[in-house]
């Protein structure tokens, strides 16, 4: 059985990256929550 995590930086940033977060309203809400929480990293 193959492992479920197959690392791929391009896919990672396409799905979880800053620009993809900014491109939708809910993504912006995610960033807002993470800022208010004081996260060092906002997105992948």
Swiss-Prot record:
Ranges annotated as biased composition (Basic residues): 1-19, 30-44
Gene name tied to this protein: rpmH
Keyword Protein biosynthesis: no
Keywords: Ribonucleoprotein, Ribosomal protein
Pfam families: Ribosomal_L34
Protein name per its UniProtKB record: Large ribosomal subunit protein bL34
BP GO terms, sorted: translation
InterPro entries in UniProt: Ribosomal_bL34, Ribosomal_bL34_CS
HAMAP family: Ribosomal_bL34 (MF_00391)
Region (Disordered): 1-44
Protein family: Belongs to the bacterial ribosomal protein bL34 family.
């Amino acid at each position: 059985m193959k492992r479920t995590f197959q690392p791929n930086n391009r896919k990672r940033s396409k799905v979880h990256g800053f620009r993809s977060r900014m491109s939708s309203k809910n993504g912006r809400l995610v960033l807002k929550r993470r800022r208010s929480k004081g996260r060092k990293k906002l997105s992948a």
